[in-house]
Swiss-Prot record:
Sorted UniProt keywords: Metal-binding, Nucleus, Repeat, Transcription, Transcription regulation, Zinc, Zinc-finger
Keyword Zinc-finger part of the UniProt annotation: yes
Name of the protein in question: Zinc finger protein ZAT8
Cellular component terms (Gene Ontology): nucleus
Subcellular location: Nucleus
Pfam families: zf-C2H2_6
Induction: By heat stress.
Zinc finger residue extent: C2H2-type: 37-59, 85-107
Record-linked InterPro entries: Znf_C2H2_sf, Znf_C2H2_type
Source organism of the structure: Arabidopsis thaliana
């Protein structure tokens, strides 16, 4: 009988020790120590990895803008990465694919059955969309004179009925 009570006592002690260890989860070994993240470029220290990531982005800025060879290589990279996304229906260009996706909703006919796509045949062949580019901000503006096109649009062909 004595052996049985000693065995229960050992199990209880072991369980208590495990619970004590589990209650310390999340504490650093020395107590109040915090983890520090250091920038490899300038050795500045940050309290979180996210803050370090934001700081590291600042090192990607142009260091010496007066070096012409460096500017030439950067402009070549910019033209390769800055792709435009033209609308396959009307030809308007967008800087981001997400903007093109939002624009494509305009080509969905609300009066026809849902999902009917208005195609290039909706516009006459002589219609051109003029795209102007602002040099200061890089945004593009499309100019389209809809009043002059009203008599040229073939509503019957596209929608299957005449709209008055």
């Amino acid at each position: 009988m004595v052996a049985r009570s000693e065995e229960v006592e050992i199990v209880e002690d072991t369980a208590a020790k495990c619970l004590m260890l589990l209650s310390r989860v999340g504490e650093c070994g020395g107590g109040g120590e915090k983890r520090v993240f250091r920038c490899k470029t300038c050795l500045k220290e940050f309290s979180s990895f996210q803050a370090l990531g934001g700081h590291r982005a600042s090192h990607k800025k142009l260091i010496n803008s007066s070096d012409p060879s460096l500017l030439g290589s950067l402009s070549n990279k910019k033209t390769k990465t800055a792709t435009s996304h033209p609308c396959p229906i009307c030809g308007v260009e967008f800087p981001m694919g997400q903007a093109l996706g939002g624009h494509m909703r305009r080509h969905r006919s609300e009066k026809a059955s849902p999902g009917t796509l208005v195609t290039r045949s909706f516009l006459p062949e002589t219609t051109t969309v003029t795209t102007l580019k602002k040099s200061s901000s890089g945004k593009r503006v499309a100019c389209l004179d809809l009043d002059s096109m009203e008599s040229l649009v073939n509503w019957k062909l596209e929608l299957g009925r005449t709209i008055s």
